[in-house]
From Swiss-Prot:
Protein family: Belongs to the TRAFAC class TrmE-Era-EngA-EngB-Septin-like GTPase superfamily. EngA (Der) GTPase family.
Annotated positions binding GTP 2: 182-189, 229-233, 294-297
UniProt binding sites for GTP 1: 9-16, 56-60, 119-122
Name of the featured protein: GTPase Der
Gene that produces this protein: der
Keyword Acetylation in record: no
Length: 466
């Protein structure tokens, strides 16, 4: 599991800005609006090859006893309990406040490892701006600027120092782990029970029935699988209960832990933006994907056509590699094809791609459609090899590769996917430009003979060309 970093502090100290910096997103803009900070913002980032989860929280008011502030305080305390490391954010420009002291006392009582980050210190003397914060008794303050990125990597390095210094490892299991994810009440637990052939988990017609990720091992046709039933991922504004908010973390961790994800869509309602957000997170995590459109038996032909059009419009980024199944989890209709699709997606995600064949495929693709020119030069793609699996990573070597456009990258991705049959898994392509051995070097001075020859060539050129 990834280590979880929780951002805590009073309002307007820059927690959401730091969250966006760590996750390289803008997902936490809503956290700046009063009354909306009850909703957690979850994301994942990387420091080099070291992944981590980040939880953004609302402004912390530990002394609040009623209303929204009280609810926010309870949820922040729950977040602290879930944290591996708490990043306590304070404002270096406004200085130490009484509320900062109250929050610091609450964090000391929690027993969680806490790092103190003094934000908004750009252009200020570090020793001066951090001096008064030693009073909080939380160790040496780290001066950062979330807006400009100053010392943010140093802060994360300090937070992760007690965790194994290892990149994300390829799966060592010899059988697929399958996470069942989707919005609440789309039939995830019903589908789990149908695949297992028994009432293994509670399936109830009420959103939020599943609170935690449940791992279930089973065998089918002589092969072992692990199913992961997860809590529903609702749109931020509709999440009310604290326990449900933190079940989101478990669901995101289940996606990271899985080899293949089955995304369950509800055909009885329109495909929502939240379905697209979940699909985007799965794609970003690099997990193989199978889509199950549930409750298909409840629709007539016109409604089925409308749902298919809705899928084409809202989920186009998943259609080039993921298989779609139209099922009824309750009656079992269409579910027999799910596990074969899972096997195919798992095989594609873990596939070994030979270097000679990759290079031949690359050169054939370039010969058929060369990359477009960038100025006076054209990118040169020389050879390719595999750099990892789950998802497959293809590394292409050459020169001037920074000029390869996204459209040509998609062309190469589709070519590799068709050649190797990589259906059901995302495919990553990384370009690496060879090192110039003469970079940073100046030419040696000419000898007397070389200088005379150069002079004769210049004279000849002037006489001939004027």
């Amino acid at each position: 599991m990834k280590p979880t970093l929780v951002l805590v502090g009073r309002s307007n100290v820059g927690k959401s800005t730091l969250f966006n910096r760590l996750t390289r997103s803008r997902d936490a803009l809503v956290a700046d609006l009063p009354g909306l900070t009850r909703d957690r913002h979850y994301g994942h980032g990387k420091l080099g090859d070291r992944p981590y989860l980040v939880v953004d929280t609302g402004g912390f008011e530990p002394m609040a006893t009623e209303g929204i502030l009280h609810e926010m305080a309870k949820q922040t305390l729950q977040a602290i309990d879930e944290a591996d490391v708490v990043l306590f954010i304070v404002d270096g420009r406004s200085g130490l406040t009484a509320q900062d002291k109250i929050v610091a006392e609450q964090l000391r009582r929690s027993g969680r490892r806490t790092l103190l980050a003094v934000n908004k210190t750009e252009g200020m003397a570090v020793s001066v701006v951090t001096a008064e914060f030693h009073e909080l008794g939380l160790g040496e303050p780290c001066a950062i600027s979330a807006a400009h990125g100053d010392n943010v990597n140093e802060l994360v390095t300090l937070a992760l120092q007690d965790f194994p210094d290892e990149p994300e490892q390829e799966r060592k299991d010899d059988h697929p782990k399958i996470a069942i994810v989707g919005r609440p009440n789309v039939g995830k637990s019903t589908l789990v029970n149908t695949l297992l052939g028994e009432e293994r988990v509670i399936a109830f017609d009420q959103p939020g029935t599943t609170r935690d990720s449940i791992y279930i091992d089973f065998e089918r046709n002589g092969r072992t699988y692990t199913l992961i039933d997860t809590a529903g991922l609702r749109r931020r504004g509709k999440v009310q209960e604290t326990v449900e908010k933190f079940s989101v973390v478990k669901t995101l961790q289940a996606i990271e832990d899985a080899n293949v994800v089955i995304l369950v869509l509800d055909a009885a309602s329109e495909i929502s933006d939240q379905d697209a957000h979940i699909g985007g997170f799965i794609l970003e995590a690099g997990r193989a994907l199978v889509l199950a459109v549930n409750k298909w038996d409840s629709l007539d032909e016109y409604q089925r056509d409308m749902i298919k059009r809705d899928i084409n419009r809202k989920l186009p980024f998943l259609q080039n590699f993921a298989r779609f199944h139209y099922i009824s989890a309750l009656h079992g209709t269409g579910t027999k094809g799910l596990l074969p699709s899972v096997d195919a997606a798992y095989g594609a995600a873990m596939a070994h791609l030979p270097t000679p064949r990759l290079t031949r495929t690359l050169l054939a693709a370039v010969e058929k459609q060369p990359p477009p020119r960038a100025g006076m030069s054209r990118p040169k793609l020389r050879y390719a090899h595999q750099g990892g699996s789950n998802p497959p990573l293809i590394i292409i070597h050459g020169s001037a590769l920074n000029a390869v456009p996204q459209t040509y990258q998609r062309y190469l991705e589709n070519t590799f996917r068709d050649t190797f049959g990589l259906e059901g898994t995302p495919l990553r392509i990384e370009f690496r430009t060879g090192r110039n051995p003469y970079a940073g070097k100046s030419p040696a001075p000419l000898t007397e003979a070389e200088a005379k020859r150069a002079h004769r060539r210049r004279r000849y050129g002037r006489k001939k060309y004027g």
